From Swiss-Prot:
This is Transcription elongation factor GreA. One of its GO terms (molecular function) is DNA binding. The keyword RNA-binding does not apply. InterPro entries: GreA/GreB_C_sf (IPR036953), TF_GreA/GreB_CS (IPR018151), Tscrpt_elong_fac_GreA (IPR006359), Tscrpt_elong_fac_GreA/B (IPR028624), Tscrpt_elong_fac_GreA/B_C (IPR001437), Tscrpt_elong_fac_GreA/B_fam (IPR023459), Tscrpt_elong_fac_GreA/B_N (IPR022691), Tscrpt_elong_fac_GreA/B_N_sf (IPR036805). Belongs to the GreA/GreB family. GO terms for biological process: DNA-templated transcription elongation; regulation of DNA-templated transcription elongation. It holds the Pfam family GreA_GreB_N. Residues 50-70 form a coiled coil. Keywords: Coiled coil, DNA-binding, Transcription, Transcription regulation. Necessary for efficient RNA polymerase transcription elongation past template-encoded arresting sites. The arresting sites in DNA have the property of trapping a certain fraction of elongating RNA polymerases that pass through, resulting in locked ternary complexes. Cleavage of the nascent transcript by cleavage factors such as GreA or GreB allows the resumption of elongation from the new 3'terminus. GreA releases sequences of 2 to 3 nucleotides.
Length: 160
């Protein structure tokens, strides 16, 4: 399986969730199963079945996070040369050529992308068009509404 880029912040967030699932949620669920089991007949014990379902979900999420972390290529933006090029992890401000409106995005891994926080995946159409370009370059992005042209007006390497 190939490696997937991830920022240091993204990896730390996944590690924190994994730690919580293993050392907080897992013991709590095991205790809930034991308590429900003590109530008697397991066939009609909704509390027991709910706890087992929760355990199954928790263990599945643990496996998912471990797989993501094992296949992550963690990229520390602070260790990369700041040469004004748009790269994974950089924060880019672009200007819509036709309207003059400005947008700022941070290019992150797929698991970290959140458009509400202006974080876009490196595999998104906008990020693919921006990566490798430099300050003042014009880029054309294919959108559902057609081709849109942007100008790169700022490239920052911000470590959160």
């Amino acid at each position: 399986m190939s490696k997937h880029p991830m920022t240091v912040e993204g990896a730390e967030a996944l590690k924190a969730e994994l730690h919580r699932l293993k050392f907080v949620d897992r013991p709590r669920i095991v205790e809930a199963i034991a308590t429900a089991r003590a109530h008697g007949d397991l066939k009609e014990n909704a509390e027991y079945h709910a706890a087992r379902e929760q355990q199954s979900f928790n263990e599945g999420r643990i496996q998912e996070l471990e797989a993501k972390l094992s296949h992550a290529q963690i990229i520390d933006i602070s260790k990369l040369p700041n040469n004004g090029k748009v790269i994974f992890g950089s924060t880019v401000t672009i200007c819509h050529v036709a309207t003059g409106s400005e947008l700022t995005y941070k290019i992150v891994g797929e698991d970290e992308a959140d458009i509400k926080l202006n974080k876009i995946s490196y595999s998104s159409p906008i990020a693919r068009a921006l990566i490798g370009k430099e300050l003042d370059d014009a880029v054309t992005v294919e959108t559902p509404g057609g081709m849109v042209e942007y100008e790169i007006i700022q490239v920052q390497y911000i470590v959160e």
